[in-house]
Amino acid sequence: MPSKTDFTSSTMTPREIVQELDRHIVGQQAAKRSVAIALRNRWRRMQLPEELRNEVMPKNILMIGPTGVGKTEIARRLATLANAPFVKVEATRFTEVGYVGKDVEQIGRDLVDTAVKMYREQAKVRVRTQAEEYAEERILDVLLPRRSVGIGFDVDADVIRQEPSAHESETRAKFRRMLRSGELEEREIELDVAVNVSMDIMTPPGMEEMGQQLRQMFSNIGGGKSQKRKLTIKAARPLLIEEEAAKLVNEDEIRAAAIEACEQNGIVFIDEIDKVVKRGDTVGGGDVSREGVQRDLLPLVEGSNVSTKYGTIRTNHILFIASGAFHLTKPSDLIPELQGRFPIRVELDALSKADFIRILTEPKAALTKQYQELLKTEGVSLDFTEDAIDRIAEIAYLVNERQENIGARRLHTVLERLLEMLSYESPDRDGESVTVDADYVNAHLGELVKDPDLSRYIL
């Protein structure tokens, strides 16, 4: 059975987690620290005696800040760092029980699905060497069928198979060497491959779980069947390795370990939580439904049992991180019971011009670096001067101030507009070097920035 340590972030300290997040996200140190501490507390809890461990509840986090400042990006990067079952959901996709749409228990089911998939992949990695050996033997058996005796006798295959002669063993060893050196990759062979019955089933909104169950039922009907296919050895090898790995892993152990991982180390990120908050000065059916979603979320966050196709999970120790812009509402508009379940509040800062400059230059995959690498594929060398970076950041900041503040997402729009013609002409400019300076930026964007009406529609 996979060990619990497979799904914990025990090797990373809060400082290391923050440093890793710093490589991709500019600023927002308070949010990074809170997330890092929460992740480390998962490991700390697992070191406690079992009796005390069950009493230590996770401190859920509510991140508050305008759009485009890094809330969702923190969640995305967290998923790669957590090394634990992790799901990110949009609060707006859920509806109160009785309404058309997803119910909040789907969150628990999605978390278990994620964990089972992760554990299955880990298990397949562990048995891959053995699976490759079995796949190689199956290919050799097709290339060099082994002699058997006892035609018409109902006896065990091991009994009727003759020991290979010295010549056969030598030939098999020769083919094995050719197979491993890649000499036979394009050779066609005919072999039995397991049939995976798949069926597309369209279901109404909110009934996705039923669709999944029906698909699984139909796939089980064809389980165990195989069909003969002609494939090159190169194409057949990965299919056979996958088939052999699936035989070697223990599905029951995977499911049990996945449920354990969800209960002890699971993390749920709920985005756009402010969209299911009732505004203080409005009354209406929509607001009633929004409050209903909060009330449905409450038992999940407090701790309840959720039935999944793999078994029942308890949500008592799952860490919930919620985020929202709260433009038209405020955190105190959440129902009081739910407010109390998110004791850690973190406010993310709006981005300044200086932040935009850092976003364009510091992250490992900064936007400017992305455009440079994309155009390099066409043979165009692109370079940004410091004054160009400064001007791009200034334009993005000004447009955000004049119009809707969409944070760092404004940089995508500005850069795409700035480099539109270059991207269009780049296939015809192979071998050229292009330097983007402040004059280049003003020439392509200056008029748009001066005209507020025009920039409203284009930037």
Curated annotation (Swiss-Prot):
Pfam families: AAA, AAA_2, ClpB_D2-small
Residues the entry annotates as binding ATP: V26, G68, V69, G70, K71, T72, E73, D271, E337, R409
MF-aspect GO terms: ATP binding; ATP hydrolysis activity; peptidase activity; proteasome-activating activity
SMART domains attached to this UniProt entry: AAA, ClpB_D2-small
Superkingdom classification of source: Bacteria
Subcellular compartments: Cytoplasm
Keyword DNA damage applies: no
Swiss-Prot/TrEMBL GO biological process terms: protein unfolding; proteolysis involved in protein catabolic process
Cellular compartments per GO CC: HslUV protease complex
Keywords, comma-separated and alphabetical: ATP-binding, Chaperone, Cytoplasm, Nucleotide-binding
SUPFAM superfamilies xref list: P-loop containing nucleoside triphosphate hydrolases (SSF52540)
Subunit: A double ring-shaped homohexamer of HslV is capped on each side by a ring-shaped HslU homohexamer. The assembly of the HslU/HslV complex is dependent on binding of ATP.
Similarity comment: Belongs to the ClpX chaperone family. HslU subfamily.
UniProt function note: ATPase subunit of a proteasome-like degradation complex; this subunit has chaperone activity. The binding of ATP and its subsequent hydrolysis by HslU are essential for unfolding of protein substrates subsequently hydrolyzed by HslV. HslU recognizes the N-terminal part of its protein substrates and unfolds these before they are guided to HslV for hydrolysis.
Name of the protein this chain belongs to: ATP-dependent protease ATPase subunit HslU
Annotated source species: Xylella fastidiosa (strain 9a5c)
Annotated gene: hslU
